[in-house]
Amino acid sequence: MNADIAYLDASAAVKLLMTERESPALRRWLRPRPVRASASLLRVELLRIVRRAGLPGLIPEARKLLAGVHLIHLDDSLLDRAADLDPTDLRSLDSIHLAAAASLGDELAAIVSYDDRLLAAATSLGLPIATPS
């Protein structure tokens, strides 16, 4: 299998919605990797970010972005794997993202994130990472 799926966490997805310093580099990095995935909790995370930023006009664009991402269902098996992940100080949502990304197996190109703690945990688990900037 080809490693062609880019796994996006909220810190990366928001850069596709709102222009930030890293947004152009992220878009360039994703261009040859059109298949994107994330845990289904991204739906809540991204819409909450938009609402917290006071930008309700971006909600339709956020929903459009989410429609282009394969959202991985959070079933009991995935949640159990997330609960058992090391390091023990891993935050709950980060552990869910890592378990979801790991579930992609050989198809995972990289976990795309700008969250240092999530990236460190992914590296410790042997998962490929990318932080285009």
Mark where each language-model region is.
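Residues within alpha-helical segments
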Residues: 11-14, 63, 83, 102, ...
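Active-site-proximal, substrate-binding regions of enzyme catalytic domains
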Residues: 40-77, 81-84
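Short active-site oxyanion
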Residues: 3-4, 33-36, 67-70, 105-110
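Phosphate- and divalent-cation-binding pockets in alpha/beta enzyme and binding domains
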Residues: 25, 45, 81, 120-121
